Amino acid sequence: MKTKYIFVTGGVVSSLGKGITAASLGRLLKNRGLKVSIQKFDPYINVDPGTMSPYQHGEVFVTDDGAETDLDLGHYERFIDENLSKNSNVTTGKVYWSVINKERRGDYLGGTVQVIPHITNELKERVYRVAKEKDVDVVITEIGGTVGDIESLPFLEAIRQIKYEVGFGNSCFIHVTLLPYLRKAGEIKTKPTQHSVKELRGIGIQPDIIVCRTEKEISKDVRSKIGLFCNIDGDSVISNLDAENLYEVPLMLHDQGLDSLVCKKLELECQEVDNSEWESMVKNIKSLSGEVTIGLVGKYVELHDAYISVVESLNHGGFANNVSVNVKWINSEEVTKDNVDSVLSDVDGILVPGGFGDRGIEGKIEAIRWARENKIPFFGICLGMQCAVIEYARNVLGLEGAHSSEIDPQTKYPVIDLMPDQKDIDDKGGTMRLGLYACKLSKDTNAYDAYEEEVIYERHRHRYEFNNEFRKRLTEEGLILAGTSPDDRLVEIVEIKDHPWFVGVQFHPEFKSRPNRPHALFRDFIKVACTVKEK
């Protein structure tokens, strides 16, 4: 079957849920037996979000092949349950970088390099590349930002040209827009949507389907009005109401007929949708019978999107144990030895996620000490694992001032140190240990009990690691090296004895968890937290 292309744009305001809409549609099409891939176009000039502040961008999601990408790729992977690649995130910076390098090599044979055709051709090639990479039936491309943003214009021109190139019936434009409800007037206003579509049509794109984000169900009259002024059939106006749980959205959009509309407009040869697995999962989510509280101790807690995959993975662990997970957000800068008892006394488990820099580091270490001494389930990820090693070195081995050389380059006991192959690297972007690496597990450990495999593969994003100069001293005092690289050079997982569940991992398991396939470590972490709570 010839590959079909779906483009999702946004209007009126940002953060409308284009990514969830694209991911939900991808799930519905996959449930019809189609092979689907999704990509995100981001109009910012950064090559990738790897060096951006979490306050600016939220989480950096890492793919198997080591790409640092937009957090929407996490939604895509969780919803369609497929591993994406570096080709699934395209930025203005990445495209211009490629075009300028081609110009320097002389690939354009002395021609004047311009936005049209050179930038737009590069953008089109990135769309077609995804189709070829995995031989998929459908490629869904989300265009970041809002129609009308000046930086989005080359992206919109590129997808306009693709519709012309692939021919009628092989592409579909979906516009996600806001329908504000004025409570005082008691009515939904359609004018912002009309103007957004007018802007889109002004650059040559006629939406085939309009998805309306609204807090109130829209009537047939409102659909007809939008259809009339936006030049589409009223039946092609879809209502996308607020949902209690993200994973309900595919079923809500199916009830609105979105996937049927897309199949009809793209003339897709596919089977009837089978949402039974997803429906069963959502039913389970709605009937969770218990609750556990997990203290997430981090430095970016004001912006929950900075830890979105961690939170979703905790929820997945809850699904597997029939409990809802209440995340208690704890700013690590505010945790001290004097207040740690009161701050953490009401949690059933403690998670310290990844991060960079010294801000809040002592609060994380203090929280880990409290979890270790009070036998509260602990899960450390990346920097969280490194902090666990530092805490153990200080308080069990008595190595006063032990630290990471990232935080204290002059420390007498650098139990965490820069990886040898990172020492001559000056550039910050894309130079860390990134992507999927193997890890060999030791038997009779919590990690092995969770995975039930000797060799696992997980995604990494770090420059610093466990310093092997301290391996012997730490293990002699009870630190367990539960997982290492296959050559035994890198320590990937640490645990401790005589504790219900204390696990630190150098990798990022949250990037591989799915709502229908919870990650084993998150599953077991929540399981033990439930047990400890019952006691």
Swiss-Prot record:
Chain residues that bind L-glutamine: Y55, G355, L383, G384, M385, Q386, E406, R463
GO CC list: cytosol
Quaternary structure annotation from Swiss-Prot or TrEMBL: Homotetramer.
Protein name: CTP synthase
Region Amidoligase domain: start-end pairs: 1-268
Domain named Glutamine amidotransferase type-1: residues: 293-535
Catalytic residues, chain numbering: C382 (nucleophile), H508, E510
Biological process annotations from GO: 'de novo' CTP biosynthetic process; pyrimidine nucleobase biosynthetic process
Disulphide bonds in the chain: none
EC number of the protein: 6.3.4.2
Positions contributing to Mg(2+) binding: D72, E142
Residues where CTP binds: S14, D149, I150, E151, K189, T190, K191, P192, T193, Q194, K225
Organism: Clostridium acetobutylicum (strain ATCC 824 / DSM 792 / JCM 1419 / IAM 19013 / LMG 5710 / NBRC 13948 / NRRL B-527 / VKM B-1787 / 2291 / W)
Signal peptide positions (record): none
Enzyme class: ligase
Keywords, ordered alphabetically: ATP-binding, Glutamine amidotransferase, Ligase, Magnesium, Metal-binding, Nucleotide-binding, Pyrimidine biosynthesis
Gene3D superfamilies for the chain: 3.40.50.880, P-loop containing nucleotide triphosphate hydrolases
Binding site for UTP: S14, K189, T190, K191, P192, T193, Q194, K225
Substrates-to-products reaction catalysed: UTP + L-glutamine + ATP + H2O = CTP + L-glutamate + ADP + phosphate + 2 H(+); L-glutamine + H2O = L-glutamate + NH4(+); UTP + NH4(+) + ATP = CTP + ADP + phosphate + 2 H(+)
Binding of ATP, residues: S15, L16, G17, K18, G19, I20, D72
